[in-house]
Swiss-Prot record:
This is Probable alpha-galactosidase B. The active site is at 149 (nucleophile), 243 (proton donor). Disulfide bonds join 39-71, 121-151. Residues 1-16 form the signal peptide. It comes from Aspergillus niger.
């Protein structure tokens, strides 16, 4: 195992899991079966998704992982002799390796799912206590990515303390992101990397590192046990909340939570706000656009979760946005965009309905990306004031100069050249929509 001590851009030092072949340097791009099909999966659906990633041009944009989620194995148990998980022969008649061969032949990579418990979330055999056996199986089958969930944990392996995850999935109230009713809180200075949750995930990390194949490791412990403190030393990404749904309220809530974790995101490790819901449910086109843009600017893993053989052009266009994908995959600058102004609320307000509305981030090309969100339920005007954007406010200014600052600006959605914009850029946005600006040189 090779380790690199890095700084997560501003405040939080982290030990990052570095792979010599560069896998995991930037956030993952791919597709996953769960949001599209739940348990109703088979080899044909997985291979169809892989073919569509190629045919729709998504592979050319960097999408590479085709991930099988829960429900892929025989539910009744493991092979009694080898103790290996058995792929469901009805769903996968040629085994997982047969699907891997087809996916690899397209120049793509195959992912699979398990859990750090006795059973998966859908009740199938999981990997706790079988980490080495399963890691070896995955390697032999040609697996390139493991999503590792947090279901089926026996009571004797639950944590002795409870960590505050200010997420509505448990039905609690979190005033300004605090856990006022938290029971069994850890004592001050407690090292969550020594918790039983962390150890369960570390065991699979070590098993994956012991096999002769690089397997990207995606932790899915829902933000428990202060995973932000040890996730980067354990895997390539880590879920920071409960599950996403195809509703704007849930997307906004997760974006709000993750906005306070951006100092943990950098090369080799990224907080994961869950898979994309673009194309699912009753999300409006602006909501789909805002969802994708926020996830891309946060440098979250971008894992598509909709049936690609029936995706409409408008949703495909969102998922194919080259400027945002270029920002997301920058191989020189690892930090994501940061909120620089909350807009609807005073700065640093924790509000599940109204996340931070103004974000900015640098690129290796010298351009600055600026995102403006309308978190309200009606048309509103938003303004990006150059003097407020951290990456722009000191760029090329002259002391005591009264001349307004101007920058060359491009609309990231349309590619339209917006010309030389002085002082600020103002735009009317539909409910729950975003504007994304690519700000270039001065003019």
């Amino acid at each position: 195992m090779r380790w690199l001590l890095t700084s997560s851009a501003l405040l939080v030092p982290a030990a990052a899991l570095v792979r010599p072949d560069g896998v995991g340097l930037t956030p993952a791009l791919g597709w996953n079966s769960w949001n599209a099909y739940s348990c109703d999966i088979d080899a044909d659906k997985i291979v169809t998704a892989a073919n569509e990633v190629v045919n729709l041009g998504l592979k050319d944009l960097g999408y590479e992982y085709i991930n099988i989620d829960d429900c892929w194995s025989v539910k009744s148990g493991r092979n009694t002799t080898t103790k290996r998980i058995i792929p469901d022969p009805d769903k996968f008649p040629n085994g997982i390796s047969g699907v891997a061969d087809q996916v690899h032949a397209l120049g793509l990579k195959l992912g699979i799912y398990s859990s750090a418990g006795l059973t998966t979330c859908a009740g199938y055999p999981a990997s706790l206590g079988y980490e080495e056996i399963d890691a070896q199986s995955f390697a032999e089958w040609g697996i390139d990515y493991l999503k590792y969930d947090n279901c089926g944990v026996p009571t004797n392996l639950t944590d002795q303390y409870t960590y505050c995850v200010p997420d509505s999935t448990d039905g609690s109230n979190y005033p300004n992101g605090t856990c006022v009713n938290l029971t069994d809180a850890a004592p001050q200075g407690y090292d969550w990397a020594t918790s039983t949750t962390a150890k369960r995930y570390q065991r699979m990390r070590d098993a994956l590192l012991s096999v002769n194949r690089t397997i990207l490791y995606s932790l899915c412990d829902w933000g428990q046990a202060d995973v932000n403190a040890w996730g980067n030393a354990t895997g390539n990404s880590w879920r920071m909340s409960g599950d996403i749904t195809a509703t704007w309220s849930r997307i906004a809530e997760i974006a709000n939570e993750n906005s306070f974790l951006m100092n943990y995101a950098n090369f080799w490790g990224y907080p994961d706000p869950d898979m994309l819901e673009v194309g699912n449910g009753n999300l409006t086109l602006p909501e789909n656009r805002a969802h994708f843009a926020l996830w891309a600017m946060m440098k979250a893993p971008l894992i598509i979760g909709t049936p690609l053989d029936s995706i409409d052009t408008s949703h495909l266009t969102i998922l194919s946005n080259k400027p945002l994908l270029t920002f997301h995959q920058d191989a020189v600058i690892g930090r994501p965009a940061y909120p620089y102004k909350w807009g609807y609320n005073p700065d640093w307000t924790f509000d599940p309905e109204h996340p931070a509305e103004y974000w900015s981030g640098p690129t290796s090309s010298g351009e600055v990306f600026v995102l403006m969100l309308n978190s309200e339920g009606e048309v509103k005007t938003r303004s990006a004031v150059w003097e407020e954007v951290p990456e722009l406010k000191d760029r090329g200014t002259k002391k005591n100069s009264k001349e307004k600052k101007g920058f060359k600006v491009t609309d990231a959605w349309t590619g339209k050249d917006l010309g030389c914009v002085k002082d600020k850029y103002e735009v009317k946005l539909q409910a729950h929509d975003v504007a994304v600006l690519v700000v270039g040189g001065q003019c």
